[in-house]
UniProtKB/Swiss-Prot annotation:
Family: Belongs to the PLPL family.
Active site: S313 (nucleophile), D458 (proton acceptor)
Bilayer disposition of the protein: Single-pass membrane protein
Domain of life, source organism: Eukaryota
Signal peptide: none
Name of the protein this chain belongs to: Patatin-like phospholipase domain-containing protein AN0408
CDD domains linked to this entry: Pat_PLPL (cd07232)
UniProt-listed GO biological process terms: cellular detoxification; lipid catabolic process; triglyceride mobilization
Length: 749
């Protein structure tokens, strides 16, 4: 019987190994408030068929009963319907022709992938290299996997590639020269520290200048994924030595006594802004999302789990579990026994079939709310989760109104929003779960509808991977995407290899399946993408359930590092079924093994990022040392301001004037900062919201810094509003003059 990794006698398949297994976190009053919010409807105006018929009385005229069901079906509005004889005559024939051609291309694509698979099995993977490759899949521990990967690299000659500095996809001359300069200056600083000298600052300033010049995202191409796609383990020795040297230099600046604390703080703040942050993005995919548990487990065990996590649809449930638990709790939870708490699809066919016929949704919203609350630790809000774990949880939600903007719920945009309601909204796929109301926690702890009671649905329908929103709010420019959407996984193919998955024949310079196989695959996939865009731009696609379904194909689904857990055919059969402990164990193992090839790339990125954060947390802007506390994603105090603190946000004041009862019921506490961040892009991003429904916290500004720049808070907020207005004008004008996909998160299949 399998035991836990800690070495104790706890069975990983037993419910007793799950902490808080029998704990009911959700307050029944919260569930009743949610039920009331779902059933409450705005008052309907008094209407009648004409002046002499009763109000609200349904009177069916002769001949109208036959068209009743057809009239209720969602359709395009009059403004969206294109007029003209040719459009009316050619719309359906052209639509049928394109759909037929897409079907033909899909069959051709499937045959091409089968050919490439057979080519690799019969030509590429033979003999000893095949036996060494099989060794990779036998290990559930990263260290053992790494030894097997190094043995395979040695056999394939990839170790020799690592020792050669030259490579077309990065500037090796700059990296080599800069690495030597950093090493020389760092050794001088260390010598002065050993001699106890603290007066000279020239050498430290030189080291700081070098770091500010090179500590940037993808400087000289060192974060190019191609550098990690030529070997199973690691990258070129020159790149690895450079990253280790930069990390050592950042640590030396942190520990040096030659520079004042306020200078160190300013230095680390600039490094943090230039280098950016890393985020883990968990895609949707129904029960395929349980592969995310294995991905998170692999990152957690190797101490490379980012502090910024976002999830959509099924991925939102996994993200909520990660965002509300500490590391120690996660290590106990991410085991096969967790399957005993996953019971969302336990109903029989007759039960859910009657519900679907009656309500249009297969699953019951209240039942899902009750079960989802355990993963979110009850009615925990986004701010409370951040204060408890230090992790920044993000959940993508799409309004049921197709014309309203999406929201990335987190502790900045919706701090008092209850997490389980956002997870339900993100999983509300039309036909599976009806749109739900987001809930917010009031000052007395009770729940009330959020955003005026508007309803929300599945975020993956429009923003499966919200890269732009993450960059706006948290300066994220390095994304780790765990992609399990079944309709996307089928089309994933990297002809030149991926991170930790190189092309093995022709010394890495070949093509998977040969050049002909890769060329045919690329052509068919790009042609499929083209015809899907044609259908969308010509407005030929119908809208089942009132949803534009082309977005589920034409988004951007990948990131800087994309993890694709390998699925099996039985996953499609169980796509809406609860996993057994044995099946969850396989998904955990597969998720871990899919993550192992990416670990070294992620480690190199986070090694520098964590060193910068450590220096940023240790010092403050006023020159005082605050100690080496645990690293939080942002250098702000987790505590909130007092309840009597007044907001200086004009949007908050306007809402309080229009809704006097609101100010006494809702608590919008504001996060205090260790210091003033007047030029912090993250602070600016908070004040860039243009929607009055989303009240974001405002932070204190450095008056001296603002005076030096020559602009105040109000002027900054206005400049950001103007920026958004200009972007919106450019996007709308692109409809007439440019390709609209240039201004959206479009992505290839």
């Amino acid at each position: 019987m399998e035991k836990s990794a800690a070495g104790d006698n706890i069975d990983k398949y037993s419910p007793s190994s799950i902490p808080d297994y029998d704990t009911e976190f959700l307050n029944p009053d919260d569930l009743r408030a949610f039920e009331k919010a779902l059933t409450d409807q705005d008052a309907d105006p008094l209407v009648a068929l004409n002046d002499w018929r009763p109000v609200y009385q349904r009177v069916v005229r002769r001949g109208r009963g036959r068209r009743k069901s057809a009239a209720a079906a969602p359709r395009r509005t009059k403004d969206e319907t294109r007029e003209g004889v040719l459009y009316t005559v050619l719309k359906w024939p052209f639509l049928l022709f394109v759909l037929g051609w897409i079907t033909f291309l899909s069959v051709g694509y499937a045959l091409t992938r089968i050919y490439i698979f057979l080519y690799e099995q019969w030509v590429t993977w033979r003999g000893k290299r095949e036996s060494l490759r099989r060794e990779l899949y036998k290990h559930e521990n990263y260290d053992d996997w790494l030894h097997a990967a190094q043995a395979l690299d040695e056999y394939l000659g990839n170790q020799r590639w690592k020792k050669i500095d030259e490579y077309a996809y990065y500037d090796h001359l700059t990296i080599r020269k800069l690495g030597r300069q950093l090493r020389t200056v760092r050794m001088q600083v260390e010598e002065e520290m050993k001699r106890g000298e603290s007066g000279s600052t020239v050498v430290v300033e030189e080291l700081c200048n070098l770091l500010e010049a090179c500590v940037k995202a993808n400087f000289a191409g060192v974060e190019n994924p191609r550098l990690y796609s030529e070997a199973y383990s690691g990258t070129k020795d020159l790149v690895q030595d450079y990253i280790d040297e930069v990390h050592a230099c950042v640590k030396v600046i942190t520990d040096s006594r030659q520079a004042r604390n306020e200078e160190k703080y300013s230095h680390f703040k600039h490094l943090d802004t230039n280098f950016g942050r890393t985020a883990l993005c968990l895609s949707g995919g129904a029960t395929f999302a349980y592969y995310h548990f294995g991905v998170v487990r692999a990152l957690l065990d190797n101490e490379v789990l980012p502090s910024i996590i976002t999830g959509t649809s099924g991925g939102a449930l996994v993200a909520a579990l990660v965002g509300t638990r500490t590391d120690d709790e996660l290590k106990q939870l991410l085991v096969p026994a967790l399957a005993h708490k996953i019971k969302a699809c336990s109903e029989g066919f007759t039960t859910w079939a009657r519900r679907w016929w009656r309500t249009g949704a297969r699953f019951d919203t209240m039942d899902w709310a009750r079960q989802c609350s355990w993963f979110c630790r009850g009615s925990t809000t986004f701010r409370e989760a951040y204060e408890r774990t230090g992790r920044i949880l993000n959940v993508s939600c799409v309004p049921s109104d197709p014309h309203s903007p999406t929201i990335l719920a987190n502790y900045l945009t919706s701090p008092n929003c209850v997490i389980w309601s956002a997870v339900l909204a993100s999983a509300a796929v039309p036909g599976i779960l009806n749109p739900v109301v987001l809930m917010t926690k009031k000052r007395d702890g009770t729940l009330a509808p959020y955003s005026f009671g508007h309803k929300w649905k599945d975020g993956s329908l429009r923003t499966d991977i919200p890269i732009k929103a993450l960059n706006l709010h948290f300066n994220v420019n390095f994304t780790i995407v765990s992609q399990v959407n079944p309709h996307i996984n089928l089309f994933f193919f990297s002809s030149r290899g991926a991170v930790g998955r190189p092309v093995t024949h022709r010394k890495g310079r070949g093509w998977r399946g040969g050049f002909l196989g890769s060329a045919i695959e690329q052509y068919i996939k790009l042609d499929l993408n083209k015809w899907l865009k044609v259908l969308r731009h010509l407005e030929l696609l119908p809208r089942p359930l009132g949803q534009d379904w082309s977005e589920i194909w034409l988004q951007k689904f990948s990131g800087t590092v994309t993890i694709w857990p390998k699925t099996v055919p039985s996953d499609f059969y169980h796509i809406l079924s609860d996993p057994s402990p044995e099946r969850l164990a396989r998904m955990l193992r597969t998720g871990q093994q899919s993550t192992f090839p990416k670990i070294q790339f992620i480690k190199n990125r986070l090694k520098i990022e964590y060193a910068i954060l450590e220096g940023l947390h240790r010092f403050s802007a006023d020159g005082e040392s605050v100690g080496a506390t645990s690293i939080q994603p942002f250098p702000f105090d987790n505590g909130a301001a007092g309840a009597d603190q007044k907001s200086n946000d004009p949007r908050e004041e306007r809402l309080n004037r229009n809704f006097p009862e609101r100010s006494s019921e809702y608590s919008y506490d504001y996060v205090k900062s260790f210091s003033d961040f007047s030029d912090d892009p993250i602070v600016s991003a908070e004040n860039s919201s243009v929607d009055d429904n989303y009240i974001v916290p405002s932070r204190q500004r450095d008056a001296g810094a603002e005076a030096g720049v020559g602009t105040g808070t109000a002027e900054r907020r206005g400049s950001f509003s103007s920026l958004f207005n200009l972007e919106e004008m450019r996007r709308q004008s692109a409809v007439f003059f440019d390709d609209p996909d240039l201004y959206r998160d479009g992505g290839d299949l």
